[in-house]
């Protein structure tokens, strides 16, 4: 197992499936990888998977983690783990994408451009539809 993530939380297990030459389901890869701090120092990220197109080409053998992806991937999809540190927040921002935020641990506050706020706790899901927003961890625990 890998070291702790830069956030102090455990590393992330990733399991990827695919098909063998006979078309039968197989495990293509499995790894345990820690999140790593981003330059701003307010969160640590781990890219899990990307696709170049939607719908995805499941015959593409590229490891989706190895694609060059920014916060979004035009015409494709991106999934990443974000660990937001206690007392930290992102800048107000907007992406031309639909983002699905699933709170696995802790809690996060979502603030919209008009100052409206919602706190989402463990097990909660945010469907972020391209609005101007910021993320804030008001707790004393890391939020994943």
Task: Show the residue positions of the predicted features.
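Conserved short histidine dyad/triad with adjacent acidic residue
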Residues: 32-34, 61-65, 77-96, 129-133
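Short beta-strand His + acidic residue motifs that chelate non-heme Fe in jelly-roll/DSBH
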Residues: 90-92, 110-111, 119, 133-139
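Short acidic-glycine-tyrosine-enriched beta hairpin
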Residues: 114-131
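N-terminal leader/capping segments at the start of a protein or of a new domain
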Residues: 1-56
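Short, conserved beta-strand element in jelly-roll/cupin
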Residues: 83-85, 95-110
């Amino acid at each position: 197992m890998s070291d702790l993530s830069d956030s102090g939380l455990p590393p992330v297990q990733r399991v990827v499936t695919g098909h063998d030459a006979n078309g039968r389901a197989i495990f293509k890869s499995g790894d345990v990888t820690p999140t790593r701090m981003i330059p701003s120092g307010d969160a640590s990220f781990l890219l899990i998977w990307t696709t170049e197109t939607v719908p995805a080409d499941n015959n593409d053998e590229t490891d989706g983690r190895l694609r060059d992806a920014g916060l979004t991937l035009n015409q494709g999809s991106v999934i990443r783990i974000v660990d937001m540190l206690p007392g930290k927040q992102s800048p107000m921002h907007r992406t031309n994408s639909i983002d699905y935020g699933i709170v696995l641990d802790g809690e996060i506050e979502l603030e919209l451009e008009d100052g409206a706020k919602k706190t989402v706790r463990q097990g909660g899901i945010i469907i972020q539809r391209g609005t101007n927003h910021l993320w804030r961890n008001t707790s004393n625990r890391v939020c994943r």
